[in-house]
Amino acid sequence: MKTNREWILRRRPEGPCVVDDFEYRESELEHPALEPGHILVHNSVFLCAPTLRNWMDAPSNSLYPSIDLGAPVLATTAGRVLESTDDRFPVGSRVTMIGHWQEYDVVNSAVWPVRAVPEGQDLIEAMGPMGMNALTAYFGVTAVGRPLAGETMLVSGAAGSTGSVAAQIGRILGCRVVGIAGGPEKCDWLINELGLDAAIDYRAGNLVEQIHTTCPNGVDVFFDNVGGEILQAAVENINKFGRIVLCGQIAGYNESRPVQGPTNMMRFVYGSVRMQGFLLGDYEDELPRARTEMAMWIKEGRLKHREDVRTGFENIPTIYGEIFAGSNDGTLLIVTDEDAYATT
């Protein structure tokens, strides 16, 4: 009999989540015969994504899931299939999925997204440069923002896992790309390593003025991971027929009250500006094409990615908190066993 390790949500976080919001639990792995469309997975990699913090809140009308108190924490995970009643994911295959902070996980693949990992790719790569955040950036830019060569594209959270990929795709498509990040070190990385045209340190002064100075011809596409004051500053600089891509609102994830949205709404009306949110799941049928194109860009050296890989199932809550402190460098992943590095 296997022992299943898991982290459950003990209480609703108030502000940034802390270790005491969670409880470690071990139990004997017992489950009845799998129902049709279910898989049993041994998880080896856990993605620290900011949106998990939303799921820890009480149910609301925001359309995202709410984790029940006493239930395992929802998360994006990667692992190997041990049992299956879904022909798409046979025993021995590897998958990424919406699972839980559990070592062993039973998932209904008809309800939660499950994606096969191709041979030749380890689980780190599947969760990093070809993972959920990177693919989200791809569709946010190409399907929602739709930048044209020569346009100016502004990206908030540009040094983060999703923002850094979005910014590079903008460059690949021929845009002048400006990234917003916190601190000179991250701004230098955006310019010197990723090849962005300019970077703005949002801590270094009036952001509306900084955007105006750095984007003298205005902003055509704004890829937003942050919301709040940064979104407002971008709206003040958006061009006619501009597009605002709402990918995340990390400025408000730890707030007890909703962060105020844009106030200059008539600029949207008179500027024919479009603001749109989206989910990766909206483009499920287009994933093969996206993976092929991104793999080509990576091979050509046009798309770079960095992963911040940590270890230890017991450390998951502590490591997860770093995503909001900005102390991670790249996509923050937690590896719990060596199967994470297998390519078959």
Label each PLM-derived region with a short phrase.
Residues 229-303, 337-344:
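Glycine-rich phosphate-binding loop and adjacent beta-alpha segment
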Residues 30-48, 56-101:
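Glycine-rich beta-strand-centered segment in the early N-terminal region that forms part
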Residues 96, 154, 200, 222-223:
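N-terminal Rossmann-like NAD(P) cofactor-binding module of classical short-chain dehydrogenase/reductase
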